[in-house]
Every structure is written in C-alpha cells, then in structure tokens.
C-alpha cells in the first residue's frame, strides 16, 4: 500500500512539474518548405533551466501534422548537418595591455587560448583579435584561419598603448561580428563574442552603458574570461551575459578558457536541423515537433502550406531557407528582456549602437 501511495505521489509531482513548464524547451529559428514535399526545421533544444540538450537522434523526435502523428517510415525524417544552412562565428578578443604582456604569464595565456581555438573551431568559424589601450582592435587571425598559429604570434607582440580599452574593444568586436554575419554564405548566421582580460577598463574611451547598449542591439552571445588581481566579477558579468569566468588568480587562465569553451561547445550542439517528407498534398497545416530527451519532452509548432506537394521527396535535399532575409536568434537573456531595455531582433542583424572612441 505504501509503495502504491508513493508511486501515486511521484506521478502527481511529475505532472505538477510538467504543468509548471519543467519539460524541454524547443525554440524555432527558421523553417523551409519546398516541393515536392520537403519540410525542414532549424531549432534549439534546452532544458527548463536553459541547459543545452545535445546528441538527440531522429528517433528522439515525433512529428505531428494537424495533431496526428506522422509515420517515421512515411516521413523518412532525418537530422541534416547544420552546415548546409547555418554558420556560427566566434570572435575571441585577447587583452594585450601592458599588465598582461609584462606579467610573465604569456606562455600560459597562449596555451589556453590555443586549446580554446582548437575546441570551439570544431563547431564554429573562429577569429582572434587583440586589444590594449589603443582606440581599435588588432587582427591576429581572421575567421576560419590558423588560430593556433595566430595566437602563437602573440608571444612577440608588444602593446601600442599599455592601458586597457576593454569597453571599446567589446563594442568594436560586436561590429566585426555583425559585419561578418551580414556577409555569411548561408541564410542562418549566429555570432559569439568571447573576451579575455586580466582586469577592467582603464582607458575610459567608452562607458559601461555604451557596452550595454551595444550588447542589447547585437543579438550576439557574449562570454568573458577574467583572470588577474584586478578582476571584478560584477563588472565583467555585464559583458559576459551568457557566461563569466572570474578569478583573481592569473594561474586560472587555462581553467577559464576550458570552462567557457565547454559552454560554447554545448551551446553549439543544442541546434538541430530536422528534415522530413510531408504526407500532405494541399492546404494549410499545423506542424508540431516533439523532442524527447534528458528524461523529459517538449514541443514547438508552426504552420505551412502544402499546395502542389507530391511524391518523390528526398529528406536529405538541402533546405531553401530565405537567403535574402537571413535570420539570427538573439541570446535568451536579451530576447526575454522587457521591450524598453532590449532591442535584439529576431530577424536580420541589427548593428551595435553607434559609438566613437575618445581619442
């Protein structure tokens, strides 16, 4: 009797948790519909507490049209490689101010940044720029270039200005990312900014409010790695909205790069491009996609028109997302912010707020 009671209580608790929204969260990025009957959906899967859900297979998804399940054998549903329709960029900004270059810790920084590039470069196009007290960034290696070789060259570089233009570097980095995304070769484009610093902004070429406005308008994810005696977590967390590693021990630089690389890697793997062949042959239809994983489930839905659909569909066909109106998905904590304090778009790429460095 006690076992039955415990089971009923457990089931009741599970139902309450599900009702409270503790299942998986699926967020639609874009979808494609093309003849003969191809439907493709690009979306993310996360837990209720915003943890990425990776490694789902086609069998972990159930597709419904007009609330009726579509046979997996009939739909031939599959997960396509995201590279056919999407590209992800990561820009790493490395603090090369006097306090970093003269610290004696450059070999550790170079090793940590190189391993970061190796790991993140598996999933994204990575570029590296450096900053010091100067008004503008200095390119170390462009997107998709030899990251390890470029970072190694930092060993022989000296700052043009020993101060730290951290705020200005973030704003200019957002501009660089936005420009790269605007000229991407595929319709779905995403950007991540990662900043390493050993302290705080000293140049005062731009204010913290300038940085906040630029981040609000960028639709770009941002992370910060801070390792040094002058590190202030509260200041850095305003920049690293998706994640901040802060330590006043310079020896923690490897730990910081590893932690942020792991978070970006996991975030990259939360994206899925699910493709299937629709059995519908005419009219408007509602599609629901249910994902099951991490001991829970969740759904997303949208509508499509099947006019002119027919046989001979191959689900491996490249989707036809809108090239002329590319989409990016703002980071959750920007998109969820009240309208009066956020301006992150769900379509296109807004440029960061206008800013001119104080020279």
Language-model-detected regions and their locations in the chain:
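DG-centered beta-turn motif at the end of beta-strands
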Residues: 61, 95-97, 109, 128-131, ...
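Von Willebrand factor
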Residues: 114, 136-139, 149-191, 202, ...
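C-terminal "exit" segments of structured domains
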Residues: 35-39, 249-343, 357-358
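Bacterial N-terminal signal peptides that target proteins for export
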Residues: 2-11
